[in-house]
Protein backbone atom coordinates (compact mmCIF):
# COMPACT_ATOMS: atom_id res chain seq x y z
CA UNK A 1 0.00 0.00 0.00
CA UNK A 2 1.30 3.45 -0.93
CA UNK A 3 1.60 5.93 1.90
CA UNK A 4 -0.97 8.24 0.25
CA UNK A 5 -3.50 5.39 0.30
CA UNK A 6 -3.54 5.61 4.09
CA UNK A 7 -5.42 8.90 3.83
CA UNK A 8 -8.67 10.07 2.30
CA UNK A 9 -9.84 13.49 1.20
CA UNK A 10 -13.32 14.58 2.22
CA UNK A 11 -15.41 17.61 1.30
CA UNK A 12 -16.98 19.04 4.46
CA UNK A 13 -18.91 22.28 3.86
CA UNK A 14 -20.32 22.01 7.41
CA UNK A 15 -16.92 21.67 9.11
CA UNK A 16 -16.80 22.93 12.67
CA UNK A 17 -14.73 25.94 13.65
CA UNK A 18 -12.48 23.55 15.61
CA UNK A 19 -11.85 21.46 12.48
CA UNK A 20 -11.06 24.56 10.43
CA UNK A 21 -8.74 25.75 13.21
CA UNK A 22 -6.62 22.57 12.86
CA UNK A 23 -5.77 23.47 9.26
CA UNK A 24 -5.26 27.15 10.03
CA UNK A 25 -2.99 26.45 13.00
CA UNK A 26 -1.02 23.90 10.97
CA UNK A 27 -0.37 26.49 8.27
CA UNK A 28 0.57 29.13 10.85
CA UNK A 29 3.09 26.73 12.45
CA UNK A 30 4.54 25.87 9.03
CA UNK A 31 4.89 29.58 8.13
CA UNK A 32 6.42 30.40 11.51
CA UNK A 33 8.94 27.55 11.18
CA UNK A 34 9.82 28.48 7.58
CA UNK A 35 10.35 32.19 8.27
CA UNK A 36 11.27 32.40 11.93
CA UNK A 37 8.59 35.09 12.21
CA UNK A 38 6.37 33.98 15.08
CA UNK A 39 4.81 37.26 16.13
CA UNK A 40 1.14 37.34 15.13
CA UNK A 41 -1.13 40.13 16.36
CA UNK A 42 -4.89 40.05 15.79
CA UNK A 43 -6.62 43.33 14.96
CA UNK A 44 -10.35 43.19 15.76
CA UNK A 45 -12.17 46.53 15.80
CA UNK A 46 -15.93 46.87 16.26
CA UNK A 47 -18.52 49.60 15.84
CA UNK A 48 -21.23 49.16 18.48
CA UNK A 49 -24.45 51.04 19.06
CA UNK A 50 -25.49 52.32 22.50
CA UNK A 51 -27.02 48.93 23.34
CA UNK A 52 -23.71 47.23 22.53
CA UNK A 53 -24.90 45.58 19.32
CA UNK A 54 -22.20 45.24 16.67
CA UNK A 55 -22.99 47.45 13.66
CA UNK A 56 -19.72 46.99 11.83
CA UNK A 57 -16.05 46.34 12.20
CA UNK A 58 -12.64 45.65 10.79
CA UNK A 59 -10.86 42.31 11.18
CA UNK A 60 -7.28 41.50 10.36
CA UNK A 61 -3.91 40.59 11.74
CA UNK A 62 -0.29 41.71 11.69
CA UNK A 63 2.29 39.13 10.67
CA UNK A 64 5.66 39.51 8.94
CA UNK A 65 5.51 43.30 9.43
CA UNK A 66 2.29 43.69 7.42
CA UNK A 67 -1.31 44.32 8.43
CA UNK A 68 -3.62 42.03 6.46
CA UNK A 69 -7.13 43.49 6.56
CA UNK A 70 -9.42 40.53 5.96
CA UNK A 71 -12.81 42.17 6.49
CA UNK A 72 -14.23 45.67 6.82
CA UNK A 73 -18.01 46.00 6.98
CA UNK A 74 -20.51 48.60 8.17
CA UNK A 75 -24.28 48.23 8.45
CA UNK A 76 -26.33 50.57 6.28
CA UNK A 77 -27.05 53.01 9.12
CA UNK A 78 -23.33 53.37 9.84
CA UNK A 79 -22.23 54.18 6.30
CA UNK A 80 -21.33 57.69 5.09
CA UNK A 81 -20.54 58.88 8.63
CA UNK A 82 -16.77 58.57 8.57
CA UNK A 83 -16.78 55.34 10.57
CA UNK A 84 -15.04 53.36 7.82
CA UNK A 85 -12.23 55.91 7.72
CA UNK A 86 -11.95 55.82 11.51
CA UNK A 87 -11.78 52.01 11.51
CA UNK A 88 -9.10 52.01 8.84
CA UNK A 89 -7.05 54.70 10.60
CA UNK A 90 -7.33 52.91 13.95
CA UNK A 91 -6.24 49.58 12.41
CA UNK A 92 -3.27 51.25 10.71
CA UNK A 93 -2.30 52.98 13.95
CA UNK A 94 -2.49 49.75 15.97
CA UNK A 95 -0.54 47.89 13.28
CA UNK A 96 2.21 50.51 13.10
CA UNK A 97 2.58 50.43 16.89
CA UNK A 98 3.27 46.68 16.76
CA UNK A 99 5.80 47.07 13.95
CA UNK A 100 3.83 46.85 10.70
CA UNK A 101 5.42 48.60 7.73
CA UNK A 102 2.28 48.52 5.61
CA UNK A 103 -1.18 47.10 5.06
CA UNK A 104 -2.84 45.06 2.34
CA UNK A 105 -6.33 43.86 1.52
CA UNK A 106 -8.64 42.62 -1.22
CA UNK A 107 -11.84 44.32 -2.35
CA UNK A 108 -14.26 43.79 -5.20
CA UNK A 109 -14.99 46.54 -7.73
CA UNK A 110 -18.54 46.79 -6.31
CA UNK A 111 -17.27 47.23 -2.75
CA UNK A 112 -14.85 50.00 -1.86
CA UNK A 113 -11.78 50.44 -4.11
CA UNK A 114 -12.31 54.22 -4.30
CA UNK A 115 -12.59 54.43 -0.50
CA UNK A 116 -9.25 52.67 -0.06
CA UNK A 117 -7.62 54.81 -2.77
CA UNK A 118 -8.68 57.94 -0.86
CA UNK A 119 -6.79 56.54 2.12
CA UNK A 120 -3.54 55.93 0.27
CA UNK A 121 -4.00 52.35 -0.90
CA UNK A 122 -2.75 51.39 -4.37
CA UNK A 123 -3.85 48.50 -6.54
CA UNK A 124 -0.98 46.06 -7.13
CA UNK A 125 -2.99 43.27 -8.77
CA UNK A 126 -6.44 42.65 -10.20
CA UNK A 127 -8.22 39.36 -10.75
CA UNK A 128 -10.61 39.99 -13.66
CA UNK A 129 -13.95 38.23 -14.03
CA UNK A 130 -14.16 37.36 -10.33
CA UNK A 131 -17.02 37.26 -9.69
CA UNK A 132 -18.14 36.85 -13.33
CA UNK A 133 -18.33 40.23 -15.02
CA UNK A 134 -16.62 41.98 -12.09
CA UNK A 135 -13.10 42.16 -10.63
CA UNK A 136 -11.28 41.65 -7.36
CA UNK A 137 -8.57 44.21 -6.58
CA UNK A 138 -5.57 43.62 -4.33
CA UNK A 139 -4.39 46.83 -2.66
CA UNK A 140 -1.52 47.85 -0.41
CA UNK A 141 -0.31 50.87 1.49
CA UNK A 142 3.29 51.26 2.65
CA UNK A 143 3.80 53.20 5.85
CA UNK A 144 6.61 55.74 6.16
CA UNK A 145 9.94 54.82 7.78
CA UNK A 146 11.20 57.23 10.44
CA UNK A 147 14.36 56.40 12.30
CA UNK A 148 14.09 52.72 13.08
CA UNK A 149 10.29 52.40 13.01
CA UNK A 150 7.39 52.64 10.57
CA UNK A 151 4.80 55.41 10.81
CA UNK A 152 1.68 56.38 8.97
CA UNK A 153 2.13 59.15 6.42
CA UNK A 154 1.31 62.50 8.01
CA UNK A 155 0.93 61.02 11.49
CA UNK A 156 2.94 60.71 14.72
Task: State where each predicted segment sits.
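Conserved N-terminal entry element of GNAT/NAT acetyltransferase domains
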Residues: 1-15, 145-156
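Conserved active-site tyrosine of GNAT-family acetyltransferases
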Residues: 23, 116, 121
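A conserved beta-strand-loop-helix scaffold within acyl/acetyltransferase catalytic domains
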Residues: 38, 49-50, 58-67, 72
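Short hydrophobic/aromatic beta-strand element in the GNAT-like acyltransferase core
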Residues: 42-46, 57, 71, 136-138
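A conserved beta-turn-beta hairpin within the catalytic core of GNAT-like acetyltransferases
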Residues: 62-70, 79, 131-136
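Conserved acetyl-CoA-binding loop-helix of GNAT-fold acetyltransferases
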Residues: 80-93, 118
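Conserved GNAT acetyl-CoA-binding A-motif
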Residues: 95-108
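Conserved catalytic-core motifs of GNAT/GCN5-like acyltransferases
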Residues: 104-106, 122-140
